[in-house]
Amino acid sequence: PDVQLNAVTGEQFIINDLFYSLMLESHNDSAVIIAENAAYYLLCKNPSLRSETPFINNYNYDSSFLSEINHEQSKILVHIFTDLMNEKADDILLADTYYITPNGLDDEDNYSFHHTTAYDLAKTMAYCINNEDFLYIIQTVSKTFSDTTGRYHYQLNNKNRLLNPDEGIISGKTGFTNKAGYCY
């Protein structure tokens, strides 16, 4: 399935809209854009981490230049972000989880593999549903948004067919990879 927002090079977004794109429709490019921005802001706060990113000229919390970085530069920022994901996994005591990419797709350049267990996934969801913003986004049925110029418009629909608060199902996350197939 096409699980991309299909953002245009140079396009800029409100980050919250990308959270909807990620959580409602599993847009892989949204996960990467979020990862690049989160890594950039981490670098702004932590000068000691900047040795990997000589392509960044300004750490003034203005991430607009990220819409113009190349694939190799993106991979560096994504790697910084996945390190953060793995640190968070350790923080919430996920004993059998390791992340390679922010979108869950395999990385053809990396010989390591994502892995987790049903138990760790349950612990992850238990952690996430304590965040009101997360719950609000994941329970949204549909959302429309545009890039910051208003030129491009996007319609999102929640792909989770199991979501039904009347039956006690308040949250969940769908997904797909070639190796795993469709997942809930």
Residue positions per predicted region:
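Penicillin-recognizing serine hydrolase domain
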Residues: 36-184
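A generic alpha-helix surface/boundary motif
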Residues: 28-29, 83
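Signal peptide-directed extracytoplasmic domains
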Residues: 1-24
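Structural recognition of the beta-strand scaffold that forms the well-ordered cores
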Residues: 14, 20-23, 30-33, 96-101, ...
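Extracytoplasmic/periplasmic mature domains of Sec-exported, cell-envelope-associated bacterial proteins
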Residues: 1, 5, 26, 69, ...
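Short flexible coil/turn linkers enriched for glycine and charged/polar residues
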Residues: 25-26, 178
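Short, conserved acidic/polar surface loops in the N-terminal third of protein domains
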Residues: 3-4, 31-35, 46
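Glycine-rich phosphate-binding loop at the start of an alpha helix
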Residues: 16, 28, 115
